[in-house]
Amino acid sequence: MRYFVSPFNKEAELKFPDRITIYDTTLRDGEQTPGVCLGTEEKLEIARKLDELGIHQIESGFPVVSEQERVSVKSIANEGLNAEILALCRTKKDDIDAAIDCDVDGVITFMATSDLHLKHKLKLTREEALNVCMNSIEYAKDHGLFLAFSAEDATRTDLDFLKQIYRKAENYGADRVHIADTVGAISPQGMDYLVRELRRDIKVDIALHCHNDFGMALSNSIAGLLAGGTAVSTTVNGIGERAGNTSLEELIMALRIIYEVDLGFNIGVLYELSRLVEKHTRMKVPENKPIVGRNVFRHESGIHVDAVIEEPLTYEPFLPEMIGHQRKIVLGKHSGCRAVKAKLEEYGIDVTRDELCRIVEEVKKNREKGKYINDELFYRIVKSVRGPVDF
C-alpha cells in the first residue's frame, strides 16, 4: 500500500469532469513573483521538467515584455516538447503578433472586467471593454491559434456582465474562458456558485486561475472543477504574485490521493521539479510546504518514529518515494530509543542498552541547549558515551 487516506472521502457524491487540463504558469505568473527573473536556459530547464511530468499546457511567458522574453518563449516553443506551449497577451494586435512570431500553439488573452478595474485602471466603459476583447479573439483565431480568454478580476465582476463577455468570447471562437480570481477573494462555495451559473450560459471550457491570498487557491480550484470547470492554472511550489497561485504538486496529489482522480502524470519527478524551481527562482520552499517541503517526511517525536519505523503510513498519508521525496528521522528533544537506535544502525554501530539510554539523554540535553543534532554533533555524543567509532 502506497497511500492511506480517510475512507469517508468516498462517501461524498462528487463528480469531476471526464477531462481535466492543467496549464502551468510557473514561467509566466510564477516569474511575476517579486524578485524572480528567469533566464532562457533556466526557463528551458523548467519547461523540460514540466514536460517530463506530463503537463498538458505550459504558459511560457509574456512575449511583448522584452526581447529576452521573446527569445525565451520562442526557444520553449521550438524545443519539441509534448506539452502545448501558450503565451500571455493583452487584448492587442501587437501582443498577439509577438506571440505568433514566437511559434506558440496558443495564446491567453486577458482584460480586466470588474468595474473597479475598468474605472481605475483601464478607463473604459463595459461596452468599450467588450469590443476590445472580441477584436483580439477574432484576430488570434484567424491565425489558427488556440485561444483562451481570461477575465481578470472575474470573481469581483458583475455576474450579468461576466456572462455577457464570456458568451461573446465563445461566439467569437474562444476555445476556453478563464475565471481569474485575481486577488484570491472568492470562497470555495462562491466558486461553486459562480461556475454553475456560468455553465448555464456557456458551453466552452471553463478554467480556474486562483490566487492564494486567503490560502484557498487549491480549495477554490477543486470546487471549480466539481462545479463544471475543466482546466486549472498552477505554479510549481505555488509561487506567483503576492501569496502565489494554486500549487501544481498539491493539486496533482490531492486529486490523485484524496479524490482518486489520476491524470496520468509522472509524479515521481514532482520533488525534483520543486527543487529545480527553488534553485532557479531562488525562492526557498517552506520547510512545512505540503507535498514537497523538507519537513513533510521528517519525524522526530519518539512515539511517531516508533510507529513510522514499523509502518510508515501511520504518520504519512502517502509514501515519499511516490514523488521522489525521502523520509528522514530527525533527532531532538522528543526522540526516543527507537529513533536513536535507527540512527546508529545507519552507521553500523552497535551499543548496549545502557549506552543507548545515555546517548538518548545526551541528545535531549544538547537539543534543549539550542544545538541542532547534526551528524557531527551526534558523532561527538556517541564518542563521549562509547568511545571512538567509525561513522
Curated annotation (Swiss-Prot):
* CDD domains listed in its UniProt record: DRE_TIM_IPMS
Listed EC numbers: 2.3.3.14, 2.3.3.-
What domain of life? Answer: Archaea
Gene3D superfamilies recorded:
1.10.238.260, Aldolase class I
User: Enzyme group, top EC level?
Assistant: transferase
What reaction does this catalyse? acetyl-CoA + 2-oxoglutarate + H2O = (2R)-homocitrate + CoA + H(+); 2-oxoadipate + acetyl-CoA + H2O = (R)-dihomocitrate + CoA + H(+); 2-oxoheptanedioate + acetyl-CoA + H2O = (R)-trihomocitrate + CoA + H(+)
Domain Pyruvate carboxyltransferase: from-to ranges = 20-271
Q: Which GO terms describe its molecular function?
A: homocitrate synthase activity
Q: Name one GO biological process term.
A: biosynthetic process
Keywords tagged on the record: Transferase
**Among its keywords, does the record have Metal-binding?**
no
Give the pathway annotation: Organic acid metabolism; 2-oxosuberate biosynthesis
As for family, the record states: Belongs to the alpha-IPM synthase/homocitrate synthase family.
Biological role: Catalyzes the condensation of alpha-ketoglutarate and acetyl-CoA to form (R)-homocitrate. Can also catalyze the condensation of alpha-ketoadipate with acetyl-CoA to form (R)-homo(2)citrate, and the condensation of alpha-ketopimelate with acetyl-CoA to form (R)-homo(3)citrate. These reactions are part of the biosynthesis pathway of coenzyme B and biotin.
Task: Name it.
Answer: Homocitrate synthase AksA
The species this protein was found in: Methanothermobacter thermautotrophicus (strain ATCC 29096 / DSM 1053 / JCM 10044 / NBRC 100330 / Delta H)
